[in-house]
Structure formats: C-alpha cells, structure tokens
Amino acid sequence: MNDLSSVLLEGVLAEDPKTSTSPDGQARCNFIVTTVEGRKKEPFHFGVVAYGQLGQKCLYDLKAGRGVRVVGRLRRESSTDPEGEYHPEIKIVAEHVEFRPLKSERGE
C-alpha cells in the first residue's frame, strides 16, 4: 500500500513569512496559514515551508492577512527547546502556492 500525504489548504496568512536555513543548508520560507472551521469558527494554524524559487516568491509576495491556497505534502519535523524538551511537529511542504489579491489590489 502506498501512503498518500497530499494536502490542499486554503486560508489567510497569520503573519509575515520568515526565512531560515534547513539543516542541510537550503534556504526556506516559513509561514503560517490560518483557517476557520466549524460552527464555533475556531481558528486552526498550519505551518508551511517552501523551498527554492517558490520560497523566494512566497517571501516576496506574501504578507500577513493575504489569502493563499497551498498544495503540498505532509512532513514530520521536530525540535528541541533550550530545556532539552522534544517537540514533534507536522508541517506542510508547499509544492504550489496561489496568492489571493489583497483588498487594496481589488480596489476595495
């Protein structure tokens, strides 16, 4: 059986994207997409990472509050905090990102 970890996510950028370097030296763009679901309109936050030219485009074009659609795959990451505590995390590795127009770009 093949495992499938494809993701399609639509939401709004929670904050401006940040750039970092992966352990293997690759430049990457990290951002958080917020979606609102359910009757209670509870927000969910998803970490997304984009590499290469896509990452550069995201860093340049994305701003907090902008709508995005991300197509990607799931990847498990982990980190250790200064106290030595292990923190597992699931991130979305972006393979395609669509940028929604900002209100100012739509003439609103």
What residue ranges belong to the model's regions?
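Single-stranded nucleic acid-binding surfaces, predominantly the OB-fold ssDNA-binding core
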Residues: 1-108
